[in-house]
Every structure is written in structure tokens, then in C-alpha cells.
Amino acid sequence: MAEKKPIKITETVLRDAHQSLIATRMTTDQMLPIIDKMDQVGYHSVECWGGATFDAALRFLKEDPWIRLRKLREGFKKTKLQMLFRGQNILGYKPYADDVVEYFVQKSIANGIDIIRIFDCFNDLRNLETAVRASKKEKGHAQIALSYTLGDAYTLDYWVDIAKKIQDMGADSICIKDMAGLLVPYAASDLVKALKEAVDLPIQLHTHYTSGCASMSYLKAVEAGVDVIDCAMSPFALGTSQPATEVMVETFKGTPYDSGYNQKLLAEISDYFRPLRDEALASGLLNPKNLGVNIKTLLYQVPGGMLSNLTSQLDKLGAADKFYEVLEEVPKVRKDLGEPPLVTPSSQIVGTQAVMNVISGERYKMVPQETKDVLSGKYGVTVKPFNKEVQKKCIGDAEVITYRPADDIEPQLPIL
């Protein structure tokens, strides 16, 4: 019999699952009644903070996100709590000064976070250095994420090279962050095997069901040796969210990868979340379109959240009929901007520029400041060079920086 290697699971229902399906609108009061049972499961961790939860709590729910974190920490006695952190962008959409990054990391860990998953939208590791260093200083677990995407520059050698650098940075683990559901099953197997051979760190896999491949990709990744997978309780699984926790637990039952999780307990947790899902469906907060398979994410390499944002932008402009034109424009803009992964904030920047290019009838006639900042190097270095003609049209002869963008930012704590 094969050697036992129980698969570990990070539960996303309190963060990415509801962020992906109901625009991050789950309230603290909706979370608290079930966390005692969730604490009994034996999860590797529960992702419950960071990402869009901070913004959404303040902007839409009128909640204090710090109070949410403290209440969750109080309720989870045994389970590690995890957050998503946008590197130098913290939980925002632009780079902040080092002192702000350090302070935010310190406060996150002090208020209850154990594991910080840190990523950069360009995979520019310089934008992660401060957050990783701060996490280590506070005795937190620093997990660095590879923002996974497709393109001829993104070879296995590319990912292996970055993974080795991440290990050298002092990270505690690596996450393959497949925010668009682009990682198909056999590619998942190849990538996990390559990373496991190249580095000694635990490897975690995060994906979305958007393209319909996620569960199959998890199966192949687990067989290839991945250590942890991200899953969501079934009422908030599938579609633009993650594979269902209960399904993955059952899949590996009786195999060397058996998690040992109690399905009866998981069913009780699922029963709690089901009425919340039904309520979201009835109110329109949960759009049924977000629950199906969207093959366009593979064709256009656009994450599910970005698809819904594009639809919303075009509806507000009275230009819903331009949707497919914009979808076709997205890969072109992405190529012009150095072919970055499409994840916050690069997904918003590329998407908005694509909309403007189509609506204005002329490419780069209207250029937001964020696009200019990308082309000026103020978000970091991309895997490929910028389109020189586009760069000239957008920023003229303005200086293009090649050093770490945050080196230009004066300390901000005194003015915040």
C-alpha cells in the first residue's frame, strides 16, 4: 500500500468563497454562529480575512474589519486563521510605503492572523520583500503565492525559478494561486511535480471552478504531491468559487490521501450555510450565472470576478452590446502592458483600459492614471517588455523606473 499522505484543506467559505459568489457580502454576524463547529473539523487553516473583505466590510457592510478578525480569533480556538495580502499594495489597489506595510502586518498578526498569503500581481518578488520580512519578524507564517497565468513566457522553468527565489527569501510555504481557473489537470500535475523537486517548502494549490476544471486539477495535483488544497463548503462552492470541501474529502476517502475529516460534521456546517446561499439567490446577491461553467475564462484568460466587473462597467455605460469586443480587447491590452497575470489590481487596470479602448473607438485615446503608472514601472517589472508604441502614446518621454517602486514612497504612517 502506498505511503499515507493525508491531504490538508484550507477552508475558504469565510473569505474567498463569498467574495467570489456574493461580492464579499457575508457579515460577521452570519459567520459567528458556526465557527465553533468549523473549529472541530481539523482544517489546515480557515481563510477569513484580507482580499476584498476589508474594503467590503467598511464600504458596504458598515463593519469594522478589525473587530471581525478579533471575534473570529476568539471563536477559533484550535484552527489557524489565514488572510490574503496584496504585497506592497496591502489590501488596496496601489503601492504603499514600507512603514505602512510593516504596521499592517504587525497589527494583522497581533489581532489573530497566523498565516499571511502574500502575492504580487506581476510576480515581482521585490514587491513582497517588506511583507515577508514583517511577517517573519512577528513570528507569522509567510506564504508567498505564484500568481498563475498562461502565456509563452510562463514556462515550467519560469515557475521553478521563482519558487527557488521564494525559498531563498525565507518563505514558509508556496501557494500556486490560480485565480482564473486556468490550471488544467495535467498542467497541475506537471507544475506540482516540478516545484516539489525544486524546493523543500510545502506547496498549496488555490484555484477557482470557473472553467470547470478545478476538481480534476486538484485530483492530479494531490497525486503529484501537493500538500494543501483550498476548498469551500458546498453551499458556497463551484462556479467562480472553489471545489466543494465535502466532495474533495469524499474523493480521497480510503486512499493514502484520506483527510480523516468527519463528513457528518461537515454536513452540519453545510446545513448552516445553505439558507445563507438561498437568501442570497432570492435577493439577487448571488447571480446564478456565477454558478455555471464559463469556458470563456480559458479562451480569454479572464478571471470570473473580472468578467462580472466588465459586465457591470458596460451596463453602467449603456454598452452591454460591446461585451465580446471588450473580451477580445483584454488579451491585447494585457500584451501591451507586459503580459502580467490578471489579478488585483492588474485585472482592474487591464479591464478598465480595454473598456475605454472599445468605448472611445480608438485604442489608448483615454488612459487612466493607473495604466500610465504601469507603463512607468510604478507597479513593478512585468515578465515581458511593454509595447513601445503604446508606452510612447500614453506617457510620452516620462521617466520609466526599474528599481523597486516603494523605494520612491516616503514614510506614510505619520500622515495616515
What do these predicted ranges mean?
Residues I118-C121, D178, A224-S241:
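Glycine-rich phosphate-binding active-site loops on the catalytic face of alpha/beta enzymes
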Residues K4-I7, G42-H44, K77-L81, G112-I115, ...:
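Short, well-ordered coil/turn segments that N-cap beta-strands
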Residues Y154-I166, S211-D227:
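Catalytic cores of alpha/beta
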Residues G50-Q167, I174, G181-P185:
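Active-site beta->alpha loop and helix N-cap motifs at the rims of alpha/beta catalytic domains
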Residues M1-I22, L72-E74:
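N-terminal amphipathic alpha-helix/helix-capping segment at the start of soluble metabolic enzymes
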Residues A237-S259:
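C-terminal helical cap(s) of enzyme catalytic domains, especially alpha/beta-barrels
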Residues K37-A57, N287-T297, Q301-L416:
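Terminal or standalone catalytic/regulatory effector modules within metabolic enzymes
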Residues I9, A17, M38, I118, ...:
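Conserved, mostly hydrophobic/aromatic
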